[in-house]
């Protein structure tokens, strides 16, 4: 489906829980606030089933920390049984070592691991947990079982800026496929932490100089740089960036049963919780959810627009 701004809707991003075993000071919480209501596996899979009718073929599981859901493996398996071409997950990696193989067997295609530091000291300052070594083990396990491409997310801020290039070196040594250098943006806890925002221009200019190839990704029109080692460095700058918004192809399912059309917006949402929890037949629920998706697509718009 194409929205009124000419943007295709291709990706469903599902927040499985707000609970997390880390305390990152800048967490955007998928732009969600409020109670930690958790949709059931059946609710999630029903929404995903309806989303398939709108040519959505990719699902990203997020949190909070999705590995804290005991039914995570079953959710992944259910999504693949629905026929999704690409099912991926973003995780902090703390529990990944023990789950990687099970997730691969269930059908998880690839994984993003958040790693915002390259030293135990900085890692603990950012996450509140002394778990750097355990996360590294989780990353290695993901590579070993074939959850590829394995991508590492690094939110650049004033506390870790000096570690960016060592992070690139670590990523190359680990053998991951790709890293994302992400701008800190004022969403969720990031609103309070935005004073730690750091401009990525100098970093990106240097990466472009040492790269052997530059690409522009369709999603968000993100710049990607291929290094001589083969590592791909993707630079993600969402804040006040109309180019980023013009390439957005996502819709979000929140933990409390809302279709969220934009990470930055709390007004452009469609509440579907009453449909999911109502005493309707599954056929009626599917019809009502389909209408909800149509409305969501109709109201979907870029948060940052070009000024004419």
Curated annotation (Swiss-Prot):
Annotated pathway: Cofactor biosynthesis; molybdopterin biosynthesis
Q: What is its EC number?
A: 4.1.99.22
Q: Which UniProt keywords apply?
A: 4Fe-4S, GTP-binding, Iron, Iron-sulfur, Lyase, Metal-binding, Molybdenum cofactor biosynthesis, Nucleotide-binding, S-adenosyl-L-methionine
Q: Which residues are recorded as binding [4Fe-4S] cluster 2?
A: 245, 248, 262
Alphabetically, the GO molecular function entries are: 4 iron, 4 sulfur cluster binding; cyclic pyranopterin monophosphate synthase activity; GTP 3',8'-cyclase activity; GTP binding; metal ion binding; S-adenosyl-L-methionine binding
**Which superkingdom heads the taxonomic lineage of this protein's source?**
Archaea
Record-annotated residues binding GTP? 13, 60, 90, 151, 250-252
- Give binding positions for [4Fe-4S] cluster 1: 20, 24, 27
According to UniProt, the reaction catalysed is: GTP + AH2 + S-adenosyl-L-methionine = (8S)-3',8-cyclo-7,8-dihydroguanosine 5'-triphosphate + 5'-deoxyadenosine + L-methionine + A + H(+)
Among InterPro entries, the record links this protein to: Aldolase_TIM, Elp3/MiaA/NifB-like_rSAM, MoaA_arc, MoaA_twitch, MoCo_biosynth_MoaA/MoaC, rSAM
> How are cofactors bound according to the entry's free-text note?
Binds 2 [4Fe-4S] clusters. Binds 1 [4Fe-4S] cluster coordinated with 3 cysteines and an exchangeable S-adenosyl-L-methionine and 1 [4Fe-4S] cluster coordinated with 3 cysteines and the GTP-derived substrate.
Q: Which cofactor does it need?
A: [4Fe-4S] cluster
| Binding residue positions for S-adenosyl-L-methionine | 64, 114
Report any one BP term from Gene Ontology: Mo-molybdopterin cofactor biosynthetic process
Every copy of the Radical SAM core domain together lies at 4-224
HAMAP family, per the entry = MoaA_A
What this chain does, per the entry, is described as: Catalyzes the cyclization of GTP to (8S)-3',8-cyclo-7,8-dihydroguanosine 5'-triphosphate.
Q: Which family does it belong to?
A: Belongs to the radical SAM superfamily. MoaA family.
What is the designated name of this protein?
A: Probable GTP 3',8-cyclase
Q: State the organism of origin.
A: Saccharolobus islandicus (strain Y.N.15.51 / Yellowstone #2) (Sulfolobus islandicus)
Q: Which gene encodes it?
A: moaA
């Amino acid at each position: 489906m194409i929205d009124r701004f000419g943007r295709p809707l291709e990706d469903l991003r599902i927040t499985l829980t707000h609970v997390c075993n880390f305390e990152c000071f800048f967490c955007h919480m998928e732009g969600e606030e409020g109670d930690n209501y958790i949709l059931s596996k059946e609710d999630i899979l029903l929404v995903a089933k309806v989303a398939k009718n709108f040519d959505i073929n990719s699902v990203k599981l997020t949190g909070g920390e999705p590995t804290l859901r005991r039914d995570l493996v079953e959710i992944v398996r259910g999504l693949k049984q629905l026929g999704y071409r690409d099912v991926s997950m973003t995780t902090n990696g703390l529990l990944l070592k023990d789950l990687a193989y099970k997730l691969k067997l269930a059908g998880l295609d690839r994984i993003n691991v958040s790693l915002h530091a390259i030293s135990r000291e900085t890692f603990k300052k950012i996450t509140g947990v002394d778990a750097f070594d355990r996360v590294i083990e989780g990353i290695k396990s993901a590579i070993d079982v074939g959850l590829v491409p394995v991508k590492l997310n690094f939110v650049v801020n004033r506390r870790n800026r000096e570690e960016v290039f060592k992070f690139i070196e670590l990523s190359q040594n680990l053998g991951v496929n790709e890293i994302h250098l992400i701008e800190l943006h004022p969403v969720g806890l990031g609103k309070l932490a935005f004073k730690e925002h750091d401009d990525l221009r100098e970093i990106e200019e240097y990466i472009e100089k040492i790269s052997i190839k530059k690409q522009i990704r369709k999603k968000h029109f993100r710049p990607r740089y291929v290094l001589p080692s083969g590592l791909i460095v993707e630079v993600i700058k969402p804040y006040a960036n109309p180019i980023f918004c013009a390439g957005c192809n996502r819709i979000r399912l929140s933990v409390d049963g809302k279709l969220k059309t934009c990470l930055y917006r709390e007004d452009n949402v469609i509440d579907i919780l009453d449909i999911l929890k109502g005493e309707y037949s599954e056929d009626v629920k599917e019809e009502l959810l389909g209408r909800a998706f149509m409305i969501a697509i109709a109201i979907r718009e870029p948060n940052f627009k070009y000024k004419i």
